[in-house]
Amino acid sequence: MLQCIFLISDSGEVMLEKQLTGHRVDRSICAWFWDQYISQGDSFKALPVIASPTHYLFQIVRDGITFLACSQVEMPPLMAIEFLCRVADVLSEYLGGLNEDLIKDNFIIVYELLDEMIDNGFPLTTEPSILKEMIAPPNLVSKMLSVVTGNASNVSDTLPSGAGSCVPWRPTDPKYSSNEVYVDLVEEMDAIVNRDGELVKCEIYGEVQMNSQLTGFPDLTLSFANPSILEDMRFHPCVRYRPWESHQVLSFVPPDGEFKLMSYRVKKLKNTPVYVKPQITSDSGTCRISVLVGIRSDPGKTIESITLSFQLPHCVSSADLSSNHGTVTILSNKTCTWTIGRIPKDKTPCLSGTLALEPGLERLHVFPTFKLGFKIMGIALSGLRIEKLDLQTIPPRLYKGFRAQTRAGEFDVRL
């Protein structure tokens, strides 16, 4: 049972406090939490569950905002974390994003949503389709009316029609003049390359994202050409488990609008589309650096938005870096970013220059880790392919669209 939820900005300010039970949680717990973060750094915010002297704390971080929940009794931690993730997703969908200004400008709506989503410390209504029938999303007209009439509440006077439905994630009878459904494969490649250039780890985290604009209650079936490569699948509640377990086919009645149908991982990949070859030599207080970036295996689509960033060691007093392609920027916190864009066909992009060490140091003993970024549109590097999307009750003039994209996730090259 959760007793309180706090929303904390990236500067430590408590933007919102929602007491959930009769036992009030003092705000001093947030001061303790922030003091621990200041003393321990980012590693503290990576902990999903924290035992404070007085409470169990559960936290997630989204776009610089910390969602912090408190409880004095033992409870399943995954339930608390999953609920906080659902709160963040709902707020992002309602407000069109997550940042400090949006939450402060829509303070009343955030409170109303939390009132409906949790009751006496237990999750209650978390489906966006039902919440939107209870509480209207903010818009310019509603804000102007609230100023004129003095009524700031967005709560509806009618019971949501989906509350009694067998599929609570979908409105009772949505209607569209044109019936459309879009399927996106969105993948991230996580990789680690050691100092010898060997691929230590390479795997894909992917999501099947959909946008359904279909009339009535469509029953969809989505099948893959090679589902055996998938691991660690997580499904939206609309997915029926039995067809997947028996035939590895996704059978579901979709929510209305955009949603994530499933997530998955594809592990132990043998190759990456881009290579990074860094080299650093140091002598007499000066280091020479050279980094080559090129295409290792052509995916068949253009590799775009290539970037390479690394943190200069603290012992480096100054840096003089340049490249034969793209731009190089060095920030005041010693973060160097090389923006390459696309790799040209006539030359290999190269970053080179010198690093000056602090007085008294002859050689560099701490080497940076290079982080690669890229994006490839039109292909899923995992090799996952959608075979077909069938509708059991086909509406007239149905349009189906499929897309895929892969981008770099945690892609580290160590030296």
Swiss-Prot record:
Topological type in the membrane: Peripheral membrane protein
Keywords: Cytoplasm, Cytoplasmic vesicle, Golgi apparatus, Membrane, Protein transport, Transport
TM regions (residue ranges): none
Disulphide connectivity of cysteines: none
Matches recorded under InterPro entries: Adaptor_comp_med_subunit (IPR050431), AP2_Mu_C_sf (IPR036168), Clathrin_mu (IPR001392), Clathrin_mu_CS (IPR018240), Longin-like_dom_sf (IPR011012), MHD (IPR028565)
Signal peptide: none
Gene null: resulting phenotype: Slightly reduced gravitropic response.
Location(s), subcellular: Cytoplasm; Golgi apparatus; Cytoplasmic vesicle membrane
Primary location: cytoplasm
Known function: Part of the AP-3 complex, an adaptor-related complex which seems to be clathrin-associated. The complex is associated with the Golgi region as well as more peripheral structures. It facilitates the budding of vesicles from the Golgi membrane and may be directly involved in trafficking to the vacuole. It also functions in maintaining the identity of lytic vacuoles and in regulating the transition between storage and lytic vacuoles.
UniProt-recorded name of the protein: AP-3 complex subunit mu
Taxon lineage: Eukaryota, Viridiplantae, Streptophyta, Embryophyta, Tracheophyta
Gene name in the database record: AP3M
